[in-house]
Amino acid sequence: MFARLPDDPRPTVAFTFDGASVDARRGDSVAAALVAAGHLAHRLTPVNARPRGPWCMMGACHDCLVSVDGVPNVQGCTVAVAPGMRVETQRGARAIEAAAASPAFAVDDSVVLALDDTGVGDRSDALLDIAVVGAGPAGLAAATVAAEAGLRVALFDEQRQAGGQIHRGITASPLARPAVLGADYWAGGSLVRAFERSGVRHGAGASVWSLAPRDDGTLALAVSSGPTAAPRSALVLARAVIVATGALERPVPIPGWTLPGVMSVGAAQILLKTAGVVATRGTVIAGSGPLLWLYAWQCLEAGGTIDALLDTTPRGRLARALPHAAAFLMSRYAAKGYELVRTVRARTRVVEHVDALAALGDDRVEGVRFGVGGALDSLACDTLLLHHGVVPHATLALAAGCDIAWNDAQACFEPVVDPWGGSSLPGVWVAGDAANVAGADAAAPRGALAALAAANALGRFDAAERDRKSRPWRAALARALRGRAFIDTLYRPADAFRVPRDATIACRCEEVTAERVVQALRAGASGPNQAKALTRCGMGPCQGRLCAPTLTALVAETCGISATEAGTYRQRFPVKPVTLGELAALPGSAAADAAVLRIDRNR
């Protein structure tokens, strides 16, 4: 279960959930407030009317959908609570029937993207030099460096504050003891402050859902402000775009992973960072990777409780990583990692080499069954937090047409980029974890390098000046990458947790099981896209973000081919669900049509 930490200085905000009063804190998201109050099921699925609750808390999974003031399909993790707000369980497809008669709920003006203030639109004087998408370390560094070069820059991000997921909530922390998050979290403050001083226009609360090249060589981005009383959308025109959309947690498709109370470790960390909500008794953490140990340490330091940590790192993986140990030991990750693991092991039960997991329960998680070398055991729990690493969140770049390649070391697809982050699409750079997962320390230098390359391409300075300015960033990147090969080898997710079996859910949105996907493949489906057409896997509101890695793994195993041959979903615009009101708010122009419909005039 979860509990709110004491000494939260924020004022109380009251709203209702299914008619019952709920006390939140100002700044809480709807989803965070509900979880803190013990409400873990927020919607019923359209297909089988099964209860679901938040999985990711970062706007990717759509399992936190609720009805707000009569408006359905609202992501509870992206909307702040307001006094008197009426929140209701979203009850499957029936909720959609009421949408047409419901006025859009209002949100705080500070959340609404002031599109006029960013100077974008169809006017000839509205052309940006660089549009940056994403306000994490890579995006903040890119925007700041580009502004320092004298370029006209705007940054767009879905969150209300800058910082990205890694530094989520850094500008408005509710924690009375900030040290529980660790020094690395607060180091992001310097990036945020530099960005705020840069004068870059910040489109907060903005969803960028289309990116397309134009005939004149510029790029067009469709941007919307979300479900407001008067939806605002615009066509942002830029000479260059830097996609810095970060990473998202890899799906963990084990039996029962869709039960309310089963969440990603990253979701629990976001609850701590943004709402001062911590896991307490009845919590089990399972999986592998640095974030697993980091959150366990943060939770315990904050006063939370972890009943057990089930480590799924396979036997023999440490021996396989040893050839990379020298570089790792010279990195700052070694000492930090040792201290995290030592502290957690001293304060909670750790089970190593777990090779099987299943969440138990009917309408919510009630326990976890796990196996070690064929021996099975179980633990009672009401909260199960899962993590098996992260993958690039590059949906926007993929939909725009950027080439991708399989990274076998990290078991994921990633955009193909040059040493500056330049993609295969002219004028588009991909920076930070959106291009290759290497953590926050590497993200900021990569964002800066992308900005320098874009400035050079736009004629702001020559290649020699670009190279001179890049030297400190190259040095910082080299330091950040030292030891990454050890981490990638040690924590590469085991196939047992990437390839679901039988009736295990592969697609959370459409409730498609692994066996249905396998049946489609054996019936002749040639890959993820045909399997999608036959089963609806990947057709839900998350648009394949959560099941794409799973489909690649299922196709590769079932068809006996490599992941490269299996491929992944073909991404389309809009890359995020948008309302008809947001579409209608776009300017009526050929440029807008081309950006939204991805019209290829050469065909």
Where does each model-flagged region fall?
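N-terminal intrinsically disordered, low-complexity segments enriched in P/E/S/T
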Residues: 21-23
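Cys/His-rich Zn2+-binding cysteine-cluster or related metal-binding knuckle/ribbon modules and their
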Residues: 54
